Amino acid sequence: MEITFQKVEHRYQHKTPFERRALYDVDVSFPSGGYYAIIGHTGSGKSTMIQHLNGLLQPTNGTVQIGEHFISAGKKEKKLKPLRKKVGVVFQFPEHQLFEETVEKDICFGPTNFGVSVEEAKQKAREAIELVGLEPELLARSPFELSGGQMRRVAIAGVLAMEPEVLVLDEPTAGLDPKGQNELMEMFYKLHKEKGLTVILVTHNMEDAAKYAEQIVVMHKGTVFLQGSAEEVFSHADELEKIGVDLPMSLKYKRAIEEKFGISIPKATLSLEDLTHEVVQVLRKGGHESCSS
């Protein structure tokens, strides 16, 4: 299900003295089945942008097309319920939205709300809890007896139980330790590959953006600043830093090595493994001569 933003603008509290423009002239497409990252400094418009994907926000100008659904300025979209079934959104700290007596009831809430029978919803809950790497035995427990990481996985299972075609992730690993962050990101990538889900990730973690995303959209002051593959985007390191966007750690190390040893590493290195390989290649080609001079 392809998603397209066409000249989208969004203003909060439009036509009031408190009006604030959050998005303008946003033209971007997310073809079906891809893995995308949206990055940018705080306040760049990332979260406002993704709230247009399932009709939580409506453009002030322009159109957002999600598959067969059109959300346009001044026109009320009548079929938001089927749209919200197809576009699952995992907001920051989704565990704060848990409220039912048991894990099973919490996961079943979404499917039953969309008209699925109780028995079918229970089956979906069993499938979803296994997708997020939890044991089915937890279905009978209160979600509030679980660890923070388990609660987050339960909340994500509630989104997956609705079998969305698009999964939107807004800082999904916020507050987790490094091990938990890595496990969750690997889980999302596995779902993307095995289920063919379109994934749109909003993140401040540049390592995750570089590692997982096929295309990266850089937002700045409410509009698209850059778009391309990780290699293309992070080749503009100086420009990114000027607008407050961090760089992957491997690029920071690359710069430090170049400055310290007086060598040039031409290729953008987006992982420490890539960096190690490129340093070895440069030294083999005679880059060590620069080091000794």
UniProtKB/Swiss-Prot annotation:
Chain's role: ATP-binding (A) component of a common energy-coupling factor (ECF) ABC-transporter complex. Unlike classic ABC transporters this ECF transporter provides the energy necessary to transport a number of different substrates.
Taxonomic superkingdom: Bacteria
Organism: Bacillus cereus (strain ATCC 10987 / NRS 248)
EC number per UniProt: 7.-.-.-
Keyword Ribonucleoprotein on entry: no
Boundaries of every ABC transporter domain copy: 3-246
One Gene Ontology CC term in the entry: ATP-binding cassette (ABC) transporter complex
Record lineage: Bacteria, Bacillati, Bacillota, Bacilli, Bacillales
Name of this protein: Energy-coupling factor transporter ATP-binding protein EcfA2
Binding-site list for ATP: G40, H41, T42, G43, S44, G45, K46, S47
Gene3D superfamilies on file: P-loop containing nucleotide triphosphate hydrolases
Pfam family name, one: ABC_tran
